[in-house]
C-alpha cells in the first residue's frame, strides 16, 4: 500500500480510511490535503502546486484531473501565468464523475455532483449537479446526505 509513502515520505496530509486506486499522478504532494473516507479513482491527476484540499467522503471517479496551475500560451517561454494559478477545494460528500477536469481557483460545494466529462472553471454551489464544458448547473441534489466511505476497497494503491 503506497498511502504511507504519500503521507510520510511526500508529506501529503491524508486522513484515515482513504482509498486511492492505481496509477494516480501527484504533483507537489505536500500541497494536498485529503479528508477521511475519500476515494480517488484510477488514473487521477492531483495538482497541489497552488494547494488542493479534498473534504471527507468525497468520491472521485476514474480519470479525474485537477489543475491548480496553468501555463500561458501567449508567453514565449510557456511560463506559468499568475492569472491561471490558485487553490482548488472540494467540499465534503462531493461526487466527481469520470473524465472530469477541474481548473484553478475553484471550490466545489458540499454534496455537489460533477457529471462525467465536465470542465469546471467556476465555483460549484453546494448540492448542485453540473455538467458540460464549461460546466453549468443542470440539476440539484437532495440535502441531508449521510453516506460515509470506510476504505478497504480491493484495488487500492
Show where each model-derived region lies.
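Short, small-residue-biased leader/transition segments that mark boundaries at the very start
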Residues: 1-3
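Short, contiguous, helix-prone interaction/anchoring segments in small proteins
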Residues: 9-15, 26-29
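Flexible, glycine/small-residue-enriched loop-and-beta-strand segment within the central core
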Residues: 24-34, 39-107, 133-134, 139-149
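Conserved catalytic segment of ABC-fold P-loop ATPases
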Residues: 109-112, 125-127
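Conserved G/P- and acidic residue-centered "switch" motifs that form tight phosphate/ATP-binding loops
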Residues: 114, 132
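Intrinsically disordered, low-complexity acidic/proline-/asparagine-rich linker or regulatory tail/stalk regions
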Residues: 149-157
Amino acid at each position: 500500500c503506497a498511502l504511507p509513502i504519500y503521507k510520510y515520505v511526500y508529506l501529503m496530509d491524508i486522513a484515515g480510511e482513504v482509498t486511492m486506486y492505481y496509477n494516480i499522478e501527484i504533483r507537489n504532494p505536500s500541497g494536498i490535503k485529503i479528508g477521511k473516507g475519500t476515494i480517488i479513482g484510477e488514473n487521477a491527476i492531483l495538482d497541489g502546486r497552488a494547494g488542493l484540499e479534498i473534504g471527507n467522503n468525497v468520491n472521485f471517479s476514474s480519470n479525474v484531473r485537477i489543475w491548480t496551475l496553468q501555463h500561458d500560451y501567449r508567453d514565449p517561454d510557456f511560463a506559468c501565468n499568475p492569472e491561471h494559478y490558485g487553490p482548488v477545494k472540494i467540499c465534503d460528500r462531493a461526487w466527481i464523475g469520470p473524465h472530469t477536469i477541474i481548473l484553478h481557483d475553484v471550490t466545489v460545494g458540499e454534496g455537489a455532483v460533477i457529471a462525467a466529462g465536465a470542465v469546471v472553471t467556476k465555483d460549484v454551489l453546494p448540492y448542485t449537479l453540473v455538467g458540460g464544458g464549461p460546466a453549468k448547473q443542470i440539476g440539484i441534489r437532495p440535502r441531508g446526505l449521510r453516506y460515509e466511505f470506510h476504505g478497504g476497497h480491493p484495488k487500492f494503491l
